[in-house]
A protein has these predicted regions:
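Glycine-rich FAD pyrophosphate-binding loop
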Residues: 1
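Active-site substrate-recognition segment that forms the wall
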Residues: 4-48, 175-178, 182, 191-317
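Rossmann-like flavin
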Residues: 38-156
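C-terminal lid/capping helical subdomain adjacent to the catalytic/cofactor pocket in oxidative enzymes
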Residues: 59, 118, 178-179, 307-348
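Surface-exposed helix-capping loop/turn segments at secondary-structure junctions
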Residues: 74-86, 163-167, 194, 214, ...
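A conserved short coil-to-beta-strand element within the FAD-binding core of flavoproteins
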Residues: 119-130, 167-184
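Mid-domain beta-loop-alpha active-site segment that forms a flexible
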Residues: 144-159, 203-204, 274-281, 336
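Short, conserved active-site loop motifs that form the nucleotide-linked donor/cofactor pocket
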Residues: 165-167, 255, 319
Length: 348
């Protein structure tokens, strides 16, 4: 939904980085053994955190996000989604700290024409009565949707892909070469040659693009989630607590608590402190909850300007890229595929 067009490369976020790193309940963490590898990325992030660069990212993300739901609807017309997607909007709330950041986000969305409803404490309580009374105000985005079970939706789309003649091979790519400009993918014991190929491996894409001598500043924002089973009745829609950078979504599996940004690369182990942070934040929002389950770590592929990489390689005309969608990979999947396939087919 277009509400998500406000990027993280902002002057206010840049100024808050030191305090966020020092806060145990804050939205940002760093694996210190990974700091040397992150320095080039951080320097580029600083350069992209001016007001001008922020608005450049916001305007471009708004354009593609505006097309995201229609692209999903094209696919959803062909599968049975009963009970798997809900159209109840999304609610952002905050306390009385960092109000300037919230005002900036609202201002940017107003400039982009995003429909948003400012809500006071009484209206927040009417929308979500189980949230503890710690909040100052919020914004409600009525047209946002959320998935009750993303895995079930993905499997339905995968079945549709196979029915339409798609083929799937799960193999480790060891190297990419070229035969008369056609990409040749090498696995441990096989080779595959294609007219054109798309690298769409999320945060793992850099391992392949480096082999093609394209130094794309892709890294990963490590994100976490936990589930609280049989608690989905406590919320009607996703709720994001902006100050601490986490959200809670009611799903088939219960309440899914997601959030935080941890810089630490692909190989560092899961941080128990981040899991504890999510559990603590969930209880701060909703009070007593049962024992959590399903601790999970995922990798958000992010670039310093928070724009995705979509389009042909600069070095090889038959290689296309589609990665770097940071927090919006699920949201932007269908429209990104449509855009890149249009490029490959030489469509407008």
């Amino acid at each position: 939904s277009p509400y998500a067009s406000v990027p993280l490369n902002r002057p206010d976020v840049l100024g808050d980085v030191p305090s966020m790193l020092m806060s145990s309940s804050g939205p940002l963490a760093l694996k210190w053994n990974y700091l040397p590898k992150m320095i080039p990325w951080f320097l580029k992030f600083i350069m992209n955190s001016t007001t001008k660069k922020m608005m450049h990212t916001a305007k471009n993300m708004h354009q593609i996000l505006d097309l995201a739901l229609p692209a999903y609807d094209e696919l959803f017309d062909e599968i049975d989604l009963e009970g798997l997607v809900e159209n109840k909007g999304i609610l952002y709330i905050w306390n009385d700290q960092d109000l300037k950041s919230r005002e900036l986000e609202i201002k940017i969305r107003d400039e982009l024409g995003v429909e948003q409803q400012l809500v006071n404490k009484a209206e927040i309580h009417d929308l979500e009565p189980h949230i503890k009374n710690f909040y100052h105000a919020g914004v409600f985005y009525p047209y946002a949707r959320h998935a009750r079970n993303p895995k079930k939706i993905l499997l339905k789309l995968f079945d549709l892909f196979l029915k339409k003649g798609g083929k799937f091979n799960k193999l480790n790519i060891k190297d990419i070469n070229f035969d008369n400009e056609k990409p040749l993918f090498k696995t441990e014991n096989q080779s595959f040659i294609f007219d054109k190929a798309v690298i769409a491996c999320g945060a793992f894409s850099k391992k392949l693009t480096d082999n093609l001598d394209e130094k794309i500043p892709l890294d990963t924002e490590r994100g976490y989630h936990v589930h609280f089973k049989n608690c989905d009745h406590l919320l009607s829609r996703p709720v994001i607590f902006s100050n601490r950078g986490f959200g809670i979504t009611p799903m088939e599996q219960g309440l899914r608590v997601v959030g935080t940004v941890e810089f630490g690369g692909l190989n560092n182990p899961l941080s128990k402190s981040r899991i504890k942070n999510l559990i603590s934040n969930a209880k701060y929002m909703l009070g007593d909850l049962p024992e959590h389950e399903d601790e999970w770590l995922g990798f958000r592929p992010s670039l310093p300007d928070f724009l995705p990489v979509m389009g042909p390689s600069k070095n090889y005309k038959n290689i296309f890229y589609c990665f770097g969608h940071h927090h919006l990979g699920w949201t932007l999947g269908p429209i990104s595929g449509k855009i890149v396939s249009g490029m490959i087919a030489n469509e407008n």
